[in-house]
Amino acid sequence: MSEPADLVSEIEALENKLQEAKSSITRRFIGQERVVDLTLTALLCGGHALLIGLPGLGKTRLVETLSTVMGLHGNRIQFTPDLMPADILGSEVLDTAEDGSRHFRFISGPIFCELLMADEINRASPRTQSALLQAMQERTVTVAGEDRDLGVPFHVLATQNPIEQEGTYPLPEAQLDRFLVQVDVEYPDRQTERDILLATTGVEEAEAHQIFTKEELLAAQVLLRRMPVGESVVELILDLVRAFRPDEAGVSERVKETVAWGPGPRAAQALMMTVRANAMLQGRLAPNAEDVLEMARPVLSHRMALNFAARARGDSLSDLIESTAAGLVRTEAAA
């Protein structure tokens, strides 16, 4: 077969495997298919995800299930104000050998895993958050002056409660930008909640089964980068990201009046990756404008902010992103 035909065959095989993974995940994490898609998107793209939702919506259950299905060694850290960097990274202890000699031995922290759940990440101090920041970006940690490799794959799925703000330390823009997507976990509808009730209060609960190995996940991440992206989609991504920069020439008056700062180049990179994953999860061989529209809010909402006047008026950042993206897609379709 020719190389394009080989690529098509590989993508189709991966799409089938992803559908198996989704089916296994949704046996334990019922409903909320969009949440499952976005977390899988983060893993396929080799990135990290920030899950925002109220307690009791199944975020921890989702991460545990993902760990099983994707064949990843997972750890969980409950972030608190007194959590120190050493509690995450690990530390060196002084050991005494049988002959009386002493030497330092490194005890690795919970960050040395393949899928880390950082629960209530905004409750940790900025000092502890910065330790996680290095790990997320560089996939290495520095302990006692020595760099230690975390290896691949390494993914952080962090959770945050949008309501409780007392005793929290808001994540700085630099750290928010390290998350590939923001996943809003909302209340289930009535039928989904009924299904959850019946599935989780009986004698037996459904079990998730491993579908991927970590080697297969790494191969999928490489394959995703080989998926072709049309020129019109590339231009739409650039138009969308630049449309939210208030100082950019030609942006709308609404953006100038409401946006404090817009997304940087990393947002365009994130869109370029996530539209491919979104297309793959929906069984298509290449992304289109609809993928850009679907990924606009998860990719951009944590990479920009409304100004004080807009927040005082009660303006919605999500509405701004979705309406602007929809307008650009309509313009592109009419061209």
Where in the sequence are the language-model features?
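C-terminal engagement/docking regions of AAA+ P-loop ATPases
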Residues: 1-5, 249-335
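Walker A/P-loop
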Residues: 40-81
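Conserved alpha-helical scaffold flanking the Walker A/P-loop in AAA+ ATPase domains
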Residues: 38-41, 95-117
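Walker B catalytic acidic pair
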Residues: 119-120, 131
